[in-house]
Amino acid sequence: MVIAFLARLAAKLFWRVRVSGEPAPLFGRRVLIIANHPHPLDAFFLGCCLPVRPVVLFPREELRSFRTRLLARFFDHETWDINDPMTVKKALRLIERGRIVAMFPEGRVERAANVMKIYEGAAMLAMRSGASLVPIHVEHREDRGFGDTRVQLHIHSATHIDPRRQAGPRARREAGARELAATMQAAAFRSHVAQGLYDAFLDAVQRRGRRTEILEDMREEPKTYGDLLKASLAIGRWLARYTQPGETVGVMLPNMFASVGAVLGLQCQGRVAAMLNYTSGPHGIESARVTANLRTVVTSRAFVEQAGLEPLIAALEGVRILHLEDIRQEFGVLDKLWLVGFAMRAPRLVRVRVNPHDVAAILFTSGSEGRPKGVALSHAAMQANIRQIATVLDFSPADKVLNALPMYHVYSFTAGVWLCLLTGTQLFLYVSPLRYRAIPEIAYRRDATYLFGTSTFLGFYARHAHPGDFGTVRYVISGGEKLGEEVAKTWLEKFGLRIFEGYGATECTVISLSTPLGYRQGCVGRLLPGTEARIEKVPGIERGGVLHVRGPALMLGYMQYDAPGLIQPVSSEFGEGWYRTGDVVDIDDEGFLRIVGRVKRFAKIAGEMVSLDQVERVAAAASPACLHAAVLKLEAAGGETTVLFTADPELTRSRLLKAARALGAQELAVARNMIHMPEIPLLGNGKTDYVRLMELVADDSVWATRC
């Protein structure tokens, strides 16, 4: 007992181990602790620091370390081969005798924060023991500074896994491993404590160190956390002179270091950043101004001149326009003394404290089906989504993300910027996704390991890239639109890279994501931890239905043009807190999501429901090198018909019929009408501009080009 007490005291003093959560689940009749394994000393921490004394099972190879062998004398343990059935039987006997057993189902020390492979031997032990599973999430925070290493053991509620519905022992083991992984992912996600985004950024600065390189833009001058901290404090102080606490401030800036500094500066001063889509034209900008009730917009003179955005500035009549170039003249000597002598030394004393459930940012829907709406995202929601992604993807400080998607796109803003800032993953921001030759070259020169893009942009990159340009890339993640089959095939054949498709919406950021451990062709992965889903059946659609989701990453509500600045809480047919995505989705027995199409993009023709997305897939199969888009047209008799816009001047209906037969699609999936045009109109985020196409369908002069 004395030795155990001294071991626990040493752990708390030297490693600052802290235990959180309700310990009651540990005192059950049969208890099996499942824990992640981020550090070689985790077995020692579990064995000595919990309110119970478990028998810790850990891999035999970890005893090669002298430190581990020394510390193993202070707690009960067993070495085991996670694939050996005899070892599993030994652990079962321990549980049957009433001992509490702790194990690491991943079988090794983790590479990153995500949950890795779960061994079937661990799942077998969890199933056959009949024990209550108590997830414990182990978190290491190695801050810069003596004695600042902190270890947190988060105890979560007990659960059970029950894969008995699966037929066959192997299927049950595989299902058990999936349930075990989902349990550990949920524990990792729930261990996160929400705070203000700027506080989370300061935590990352402290954890990684101010000299650590974190951000690079097209100037190719690496910037450190310290550079970003200084920029955020300076820009924040300058912006605070022209704005009020809690005010929504428009941000119209490209993907640059100063843009990230401006967003962080607004967060530092307790302002709300409204990310403006500068490709939406004067009408779109004016709509966003009214919707978000903007009085101030921050931009750059150089950006406005180079991008030709003068008409957008003119549309912001009555709005104060702040240019980042002016900070050099307006940031005086006293400001610089404040920055260097006080703010940089104690940034937490100058930042404005915020409620994590207050609005952090406003993004706008794409407007592909009507007037854009403002989407209010809270600090807690954005951090929740970042945490969800980090539990399924192995981001680490050794990675470098190449992100060319504009920050007004939620996919780019959350996963492409904030995730990197808060996890310490290096980020390269490129100013435009439209430079199809430059982006592959940057990936080659800067050793990018992650590439974010939409299907449209990824297709163009593949067309212009050299086979060696993406040699260092580990993950290519597609989002924002349906991944084209031809695009996925091209990337696999030309670069040897599988594209992992994500699915989400501005209203709830990323909902599901394909990963190496959760991949099925034609699907968009499984729901992220903490996200719930329900399906609303649609008459005429046999498989799947409209997806409704609920979770911690959901928006606070919409802002509408006719109710400026007012946040309208989200709800759906299933009640408050549920969001109706409008997408028809089919979820299989293993939890994989398959997107069937938008519910608004189904036509009833000859008594059958026809998906416009299927019409586009047939066109893509017939002419994979060109873009195509399908819309509905109301006929004079009151029915509906399909219209295909194509950039292929040689595409004919006979080719479409041949492609439909090859795909096994019904003949109704071949468009009744076809219009050739030089290029398909796109929005700034790469999505098809269906509003513009509907306007063209209504224009009689366009039908002169009909085939």
Q: Which sequence ranges carry the predicted segments?
A:
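Conserved AMP-binding/adenylate-forming
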Residues: W238-S280, A404-P406, M609
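AMP-binding/adenylate-forming catalytic core of the ANL superfamily
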Residues: V297, L451, G551, L556-G557, ...
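Gly/Ser/Thr-rich phosphate-binding loop
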Residues: L324, A448-G453, A462-Q521, E532-R534
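Conserved AMP-binding/adenylation subdomain of ANL enzymes
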Residues: Q383-K400, V410-T449, H464
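Conserved ATP/PPi-binding loop(s) of AMP-dependent carboxylate-activating enzymes
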Residues: C523-G530, P539-S572, E608-V610
